[in-house]
């Protein structure tokens, strides 16, 4: 996964996260179905909006994986006294930090586009996810479809579904919470295999 390369991209990322994501975040976290005994990871935590929602469900443990140093500083300041572990590693390799089959839920909001190669990330998610664990992707494919394909690698749902199905049971739906800017694809992956 890549961090924003320029100040302009970083600024755009922050504004998009703040204004367009709140309804998507609320809906996504609700759909994830977090319970008190869950270990939850958010990949690409950005400014921490989704972490606030996750925190409201009072899971046993929360991990925030964020490769941007700038966003990690924001997270460290915002959640300094919370039960949230902030990780700066790329999500493709969390082996030194998260043991096998210890995570119940993984949330990724507007992150799938940057996971390259996608299979490497899916293999790592499979490793850390408990049997019957769930991954929830919230994606807006239409707005990013015309962006630079060197950066935005996974912008077509139909093209990424075969990779997702190699590792997990997959369900997806187009969600319209009422505002045009909050429409998104909800992709839920379930780890039905024990290994």
Regions found by a protein language model. Give the residues of each.
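A short acidic, Gly/Pro-enriched loop at the edge of an enzyme's catalytic core
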Residues: 96-106
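Conserved SAM-binding loop and adjacent beta-strand
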Residues: 10-26
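A short glycine-rich, Lys/Arg-flanked "PGG" loop and its adjoining helix->strand segment in the class I
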Residues: 119-131
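A short SAM/SAH-binding and catalytic strip from SAM-dependent methyltransferases
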Residues: 104-118
């Amino acid at each position: 996964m890549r961090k924003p390369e320029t100040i302009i991209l970083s600024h755009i990322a922050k504004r998009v996260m703040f204004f367009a994501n709140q309804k998507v975040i609320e809906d996504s976290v609700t759909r994830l179905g977090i319970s008190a005994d869950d270990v939850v990871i958010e990949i690409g935590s950005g400014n921490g909006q989704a972490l606030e929602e996750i925190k409201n469900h009072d899971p046993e443990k929360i991990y925030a994986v964020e490769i941007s140093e700038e966003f990690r500083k924001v997270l460290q300041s915002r959640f300094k006294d919370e039960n949230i572990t902030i990780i700066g590693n790329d999500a493709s390799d969390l082996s030194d930090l998260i043991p096998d089959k210890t995570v119940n839920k993984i949330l990724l909001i507007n992150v799938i586009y940057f996971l390259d190669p996608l299979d490497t990330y899916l293999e790592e998610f499979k490793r850390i996810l408990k049997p019957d664990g769930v991954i929830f992707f919230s994606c807006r494919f239409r707005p990013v479809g015309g962006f630079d394909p060197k950066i935005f690698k996974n912008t077509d749902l139909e093209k990424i579904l075969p990779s997702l199905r190699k590792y997990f049971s997959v369900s997806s739906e187009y969600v319209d919470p009422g505002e045009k800017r909050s429409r998104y694809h909800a992709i839920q992956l379930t780890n039905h295999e024990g290994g």
